[in-house]
């Protein structure tokens, strides 16, 4: 594992392992982004803070919102620019069956997602992706993201228990049988620019 710490930065550390970016803010809150690109431009770059100066809760919250906005904009750029020459194919939501993965445990969820992504890369060597976590009000974590170059994915049309096809805004919804940890929804991407903003909104 490579641990990358920005020079003159005392507020956080970025950990790079495989295709993971983990950002720890000053309040110890962590955000994990999975993606298939070697560099997430500008991610986590902050000015040095004087550790001897006590930060008020108001200032801490202001910093958190500023960092969150920067992270969202970086994700928008990452998805948008890497979809210009070769468009993204699928928007994906992955949730966890509590009997398979304890989605209340953030570290367990990250480990399971990393394992699944590694497996998908092995099956689809040219796969590109960006995945971001969303924390539900219940405390459970699920994931949203975009993918392309996944010829060995097995997609089946999603249906209600009565057999009716499930569609959203007129588009067919699919289930991904390659995912064994829980439940999936997959849709074909129609608007490359809109999907970059759509994924970033789940980062909270």
Model feature map: region roles:
Residues 62-138:
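Signature for HUH/AEP ssDNA processing cores
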Residues 106, 125-130, 136-141, 147-204:
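Conserved His + Asp/Glu catalytic blocks
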Residues 34, 88-91, 96, 147, ...:
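Phenylalanine-focused residue identity feature
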Residues 6, 12, 35, 81, ...:
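Histidine (H) residue identity feature
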Residues 1-78, 86:
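DNA replication initiation on ssDNA origins
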Residues 14-16, 22, 92-94, 131, ...:
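Generic structural hydrophobic/aromatic packing signal, biased to beta-strands
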Residues 57-86, 95-97, 170-204:
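Catalytic "initiation/cleavage/transfer" segments centered on a nucleophilic residue
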């Amino acid at each position: 594992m490579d641990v990358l710490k920005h020079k003159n930065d005392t507020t956080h550390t970025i950990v790079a392992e495989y295709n993971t970016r983990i950002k720890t803010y000053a309040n110890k809150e962590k955000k994990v982004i999975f993606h298939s690109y070697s560099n997430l431009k500008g991610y986590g770059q902050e000015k040095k803070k004087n550790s001897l100066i006590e930060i008020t809760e108001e200032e801490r919250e202001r910093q958190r919102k500023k960092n969150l906005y920067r992270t969202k904009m970086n994700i928008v750029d990452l998805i948008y620019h890497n979809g210009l020459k070769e468009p993204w194919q699928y928007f994906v939501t992955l949730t966890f069956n509590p009997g398979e993965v304890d989605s209340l445990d953030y570290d367990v969820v990250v480990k399971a997602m990393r394992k699944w992504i590694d497996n998908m890369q092995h099956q689809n060597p040219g796969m590109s992706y960006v995945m971001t976590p969303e924390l539900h009000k219940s405390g459970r974590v699920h994931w949203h993201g975009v993918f392309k170059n996944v010829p060995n994915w097995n997609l089946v049309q999603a249906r209600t228990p009565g057999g009716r096809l499930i569609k959203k805004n007129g588009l067919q919804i699919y289930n991904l049988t390659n995912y064994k940890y829980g439940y999936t929804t997959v849709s074909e991407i129609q608007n490359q620019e809109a999907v970059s903003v759509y994924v970033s909104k789940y980062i909270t």
